[in-house]
């Protein structure tokens, strides 16, 4: 009898275990076996059917509940404080501004009182606690949120759908076959012809906010402008994404981007902007990140060379008293050369490569910074400098959460032309191949390590260019790394605006070439753009032109015909100068 009871209990335990496993599998029947490598095997709190609704509701609730009090003080008043010598828009190559970018200077130029800082720190901490609490989704739950595998994401709507159209054609022209999702913001829904008839032919589709996010959370946030980008990255169906602004054109095949060492090592690839960082110490205090004031670890983007190579207070430390060294680090070393800070340069978010599973929380915290960007974080992180907006919120979020990322070390190149003497028109940022950059960075590390004695000597002539960018971060033959993206953010490929603003026309009415570096990206990019715009909107019968909402009231007007004449004239000019532009001999 006792043996039978024991057998019955054992059988009950086995049956219960089987039922439990079947329940777990039923909830996750569309999730890969990647749950096996999760740190903890947790039964899901949310069933698959309501996972997304609960996620977005919980996320928005956490953002709303942790709204910072009041709003940021006026920057002009902060910058007018005694002892503030704020240097606006310090470029990568600018020298003589180390003291302006120092811990002491940036502290004085963005000096929040302790009560305000503590209030900001409290709500920031509560939100990050939610990331490790209610929003601490397991690997399988994260994967269930995003049904797609990997692809390219951009933001459309309005004129940005027109820009995305040309950008996508350039992607396919380079041989990139990855699927594409165009995120359509709530106020721009209705791009039916573009979304339903044209985009599927190019292995793409539109994603509408209203199809993904419940209406109440969406209305609670009232997203605009930069905020739409980060939320768009979250609602995309892909687990791994290459994000491109709609005016950013890939000139290399991107199909293998997710198989690169740099991406697998970090899960987040970023590119540099033109400007030095001016994020104040107050931000680091708010996010709970410690700055080691006595430890310098880099010279702008050079974190390979020993500090003794460029800082005499380190190479000849015995020549200075502890007080002199402390004053040096506080007053004369750029804050973002110190240990515990985000590295220079500031970031440019027109292109990013992101593992959304690995950097799930990074994106959620970046969304928090963007929702409260206009009232607090944009001004705090960038202090009103050029390009203020979402661009530095991604690196800030990764830094706050101590997550890995790689920012391309090679500075971008400009492309543009002189409209008149001393009147340079910058048209595009040329960003470099991230994997080439990463591999060269690793080679440079090995070179410095193998010659550490030589590199440790103080070099009085050291500059970022001659000590790092033009020596360690170039190919073995001395040539520059490849260009991967043309971010044409100044004269956007919107034919209507180009025509009305008389772009690519000189001061005397003559045709001019704007893009002057085809040798760097291996093609006549300007001819591609204008040929495509003319072919898509002018040589095609008007009845067959894609019915973009942006063009609704423009197509059947005399000005449309004038626009087409403008495009044709410029195409003719570009074709006549093509060989010369490409350096070809007749």
UniProtKB/Swiss-Prot annotation:
<keyword id="KW-0333">Golgi apparatus</keyword>
<dbReference type="GO" id="GO:0006486">
    <property type="term" value="P:protein glycosylation"/>
</dbReference>
<dbReference type="GO" id="GO:0000026">
    <property type="term" value="F:alpha-1,2-mannosyltransferase activity"/>
</dbReference>
<keyword id="KW-0325">Glycoprotein</keyword>
<dbReference type="Pfam" id="PF11051">
    <property type="entry name" value="Mannosyl_trans3"/>
</dbReference>
<dbReference type="InterPro" id="IPR029044">
    <property type="entry name" value="Nucleotide-diphossugar_trans"/>
</dbReference>
<feature type="glycosylation site" description="N-linked (GlcNAc...) asparagine">
    <location>
        <position position="264"/>
    </location>
</feature>
<comment type="similarity">
    <text>Belongs to the MNN1/MNT family.</text>
</comment>
<dbReference type="InterPro" id="IPR022751">
    <property type="entry name" value="Alpha_mannosyltransferase"/>
</dbReference>
<dbReference type="GO" id="GO:0005794">
    <property type="term" value="C:Golgi apparatus"/>
</dbReference>
<comment type="subunit">
    <text>Interacts with SVP26.</text>
</comment>
<keyword id="KW-0328">Glycosyltransferase</keyword>
<feature type="glycosylation site" description="N-linked (GlcNAc...) asparagine">
    <location>
        <position position="113"/>
    </location>
</feature>
<feature type="signal peptide">
    <location>
        <begin position="1"/>
        <end position="29"/>
    </location>
</feature>
<comment type="function">
    <text>Responsible for addition of first and second mannose residues to the outer chain of core N-linked polysaccharides and to O-linked mannotriose. Implicated in late Golgi modifications.</text>
</comment>
<feature type="glycosylation site" description="N-linked (GlcNAc...) asparagine">
    <location>
        <position position="259"/>
    </location>
</feature>
<keyword id="KW-0732">Signal</keyword>
<feature type="glycosylation site" description="N-linked (GlcNAc...) asparagine">
    <location>
        <position position="136"/>
    </location>
</feature>
<comment type="pathway">
    <text>Protein modification; protein glycosylation.</text>
</comment>
<protein>
    <recommendedName>
        <fullName>Alpha-1,2-mannosyltransferase MNN5</fullName>
        <ecNumber>2.4.1.-</ecNumber>
    </recommendedName>
</protein>
<dbReference type="GO" id="GO:0046354">
    <property type="term" value="P:mannan biosynthetic process"/>
</dbReference>
<keyword id="KW-0808">Transferase</keyword>
<dbReference type="GO" id="GO:0035268">
    <property type="term" value="P:protein mannosylation"/>
</dbReference>
């Amino acid at each position: 009898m006792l043996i039978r009871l024991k057998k019955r209990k054992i059988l009950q335990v086995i049956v219960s275990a089987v039922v439990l496993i079947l329940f777990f599998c039923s909830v996750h029947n569309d999730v890969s076996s990647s749950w096996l490598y999760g740190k903890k095997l947790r039964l899901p709190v949310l069933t698959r059917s309501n996972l997304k609704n609960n996620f977005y509701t919980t996320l928005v609730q956490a953002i709303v509940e942790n709204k910072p009090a009041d709003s940021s003080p006026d920057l002009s008043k902060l910058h007018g404080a005694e002892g503030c010598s704020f240097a606006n828009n310090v470029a990568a190559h600018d020298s003589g501004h180390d003291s302006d970018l120092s811990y002491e200077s940036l502290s004085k130029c963005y000096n929040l009182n302790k009560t305000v800082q503590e209030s900001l720190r409290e709500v920031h901490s509560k939100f990050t606690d939610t990331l490790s609490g209610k929003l601490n989704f397991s690997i399988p739950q994260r994967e269930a949120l995003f049904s797609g595998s990997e692809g390219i994401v951009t933001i459309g709507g309005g004129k940005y759908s027109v820009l995305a159209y040309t950008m996508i054609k350039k992607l396919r022209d380079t041989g990139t076959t990855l699927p594409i999702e165009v995120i359509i913001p709530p106020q721009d829904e209705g791009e039916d012809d573009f979304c339903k008839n044209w985009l599927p032919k190019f292995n793409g589709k539109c994603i509408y906010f209203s199809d993904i996010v419940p209406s109440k959370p969406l209305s609670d946030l009232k997203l605009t402008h930069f905020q739409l980008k980060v939320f768009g990255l979250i609602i995309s169906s892909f687990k791994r994404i290459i994000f491109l602004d709609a005016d950013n054109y890939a000139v290399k095949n991107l199909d293998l981007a997710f198989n690169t060492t740099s991406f697998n090592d970090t899960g987040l690839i970023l590119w540099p902007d033109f400007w030095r960082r001016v994020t104040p110490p107050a931000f680091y205090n708010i996010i709970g990140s410690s700055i080691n004031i006595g430890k310098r670890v880099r010279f702008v983007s050079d974190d390979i060379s020993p500090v003794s190579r460029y800082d005499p207070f380190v190479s000849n430390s015995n020549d200075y008293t502890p007080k002199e060294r402390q004053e040096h680090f506080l007053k004369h070393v750029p804050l973002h050369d110190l240990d515990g800070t985000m590295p220079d340069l500031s970031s440019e978010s027109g292109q990013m490569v992101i593992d959304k599973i690995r950097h799930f929380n990074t994106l959620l915290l970046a969304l928090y910074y963007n929702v409260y960007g206009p009232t607090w974080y944009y001004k705090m992180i960038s202090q009103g400098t050029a390009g203020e907006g979402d661009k530095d919120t991604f690196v800030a979020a990764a830094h706050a959460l101590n997550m890995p990322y790689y920012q391309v070390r090679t500075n971008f190149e400009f492309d543009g032309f002189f409209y008149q003497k001393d009147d340079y028109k910058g048209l595009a940022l040329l960003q470099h191949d991230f994997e080439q950059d990463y591999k060269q960075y690793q080679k440079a590390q090995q070179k410095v390590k193998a010659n550490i004695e030589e590199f440790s000597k103080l070099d009085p002539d050291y500059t970022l260019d001659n000590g790092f960018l033009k020596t360690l971060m170039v190919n073995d033959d001395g040539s520059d790394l490849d260009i991967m993206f043309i971010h044409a953010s100044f004269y956007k490929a919107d034919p209507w605006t180009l025509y009305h603003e008389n772009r690519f026309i000189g001061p005397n009415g003559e045709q001019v070439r704007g893009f002057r570096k085809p040798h760097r990206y291996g093609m006549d990019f300007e001819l591609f753009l204008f040929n495509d715009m003319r072919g898509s909107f002018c040589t095609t019968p008007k009845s067959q032109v894609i019915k973009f909402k942006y063009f609704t009231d423009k197509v059947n007007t005399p000005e449309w015909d004038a626009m087409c004449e403008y495009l044709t004239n410029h195409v003719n000019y570009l074709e006549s100068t093509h060989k010369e532009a490409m350096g070809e001999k007749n």
